[in-house]
Amino acid sequence: MSTPTPLSYKDAGVDIDAGNALVSNIKAAVKRTRRPEVMGNLGGFGALCEIPTKYKQPVLVSGTDGVGTKLRLAIDYKKHDTVGIDLVAMCVNDLIVQGAEPLFFLDYYATGKLDVETATSVVNGIGEGCFQSGCALIGGETAEMPGMYEGEDYDLAGFCVGVVEKADIIDGSKVAAGDALIALASSGPHSNGYSLVRKVLEVSQADPQQDLNGKPLIEHLLEPTKIYVKSLLKLIEASDVHAMAHITGGGFWENIPRVLPDNCKAVIQGDSWQWPAVFSWLMENGNIAQYEMYRTFNCGVGMIVALPADKVDAALALLAAEGEQAWLIGAIAHREGNEEQVEIL
């Protein structure tokens, strides 16, 4: 009887050495995001982080999210360096809505076969997103799972924790009729609606490399999600922000009501901004109804802020100084009975 060939984990499709190489590659990206509250170094069983001492009654705010099927486009077109920014943005933009300063972030990267170069590019993007939001990348998990994913496909998930002073939590309870609504421009579709985006590409048989307003269509579609944290933290400090809505899945119709009292509705002037070209292209080439566009995509509006009408000019000036494109998009009105909570005129 012949002696069986000894098996290793690598024979089963899991390369521990590749995982170690990835950890080595990302150390600089992680170090760049370090905050003074972080304790210990990368590689521990658990990641430690103190709460900043400036908070008297700190409340922790947590969020988790992914990038959705935008990853399919990124994988197909081998554009891996920005989806990590998307991952962070989807989490930290949700935290800032409640007034929370992001503290730390952890990522989960799952794949069938670990490609160190691809994974390094992705995690470096996560580090860039954390840097943009002032958030420490303190840990994560890389799971190589042969048989679970096709080829070198991968999926991402992120988890973020932030902190806000208990007295300063923004929960929409101060929103009242007469408040103004300010919009902050998006960078593109961000990370929502990509199953519909891909369907439009399929049905229209469009060339993703075709020119749209001076750059390839695929670059518009893979533009990373804008991170609003630093500019909105300054606005919160300087103004009286009553509510914020991150325009993600569900678009205008579902996200704005999440931060409104039952007796209030948002009245939005649909002609107060021009849709970026990518949304007009999607609408035309997919024959998508306007209602569906507002339900699926941000249509050029990544964040909406509600605040007193007399604070608008100062808020717009501050946001402009922070590099944000922002404009007055509408107002809060009294809601009667079962009226819809969002009207776009």
Swiss-Prot record:
For this UniProt record, the keywords arranged alphabetically read as follows: ATP-binding, Cytoplasm, Ligase, Nucleotide-binding, Purine biosynthesis
Major place of residence:
cytoplasm
**UniProt GO MF annotations:** ATP binding; phosphoribosylamine-glycine ligase activity; phosphoribosylformylglycinamidine cyclo-ligase activity
By its UniProt entry, which InterPro entries does this protein fall under? PurM-like_C_dom, PurM-like_C_sf, PurM-like_N, PurM-like_N_sf, PurM_cligase
Q: One biological process GO term for this chain?
A: adenine biosynthetic process
One annotated Gene Ontology cellular component of this protein: cytosol
Pathway the protein takes part in: Purine metabolism; IMP biosynthesis via de novo pathway; 5-amino-1-(5-phospho-D-ribosyl)imidazole from N(2)-formyl-N(1)-(5-phospho-D-ribosyl)glycinamide: step 2/2
Q: Which reaction does it catalyse?
A: 2-formamido-N(1)-(5-O-phospho-beta-D-ribosyl)acetamidine + ATP = 5-amino-1-(5-phospho-beta-D-ribosyl)imidazole + ADP + phosphate + H(+)
EC number(s) in its UniProt entry? 6.3.3.1
Q: Where do transmembrane segments lie in this chain?
A: none
Q: Does the keyword Transmembrane helix apply?
A: no
State where the protein is found.
Answer: Cytoplasm
Question: HAMAP family given for it?
Answer: AIRS
Q: Which family does it belong to?
A: Belongs to the AIR synthase family.
Mind telling me what this protein is named? Phosphoribosylformylglycinamidine cyclo-ligase
Q: Which organism is it from?
A: Shewanella putrefaciens (strain CN-32 / ATCC BAA-453)
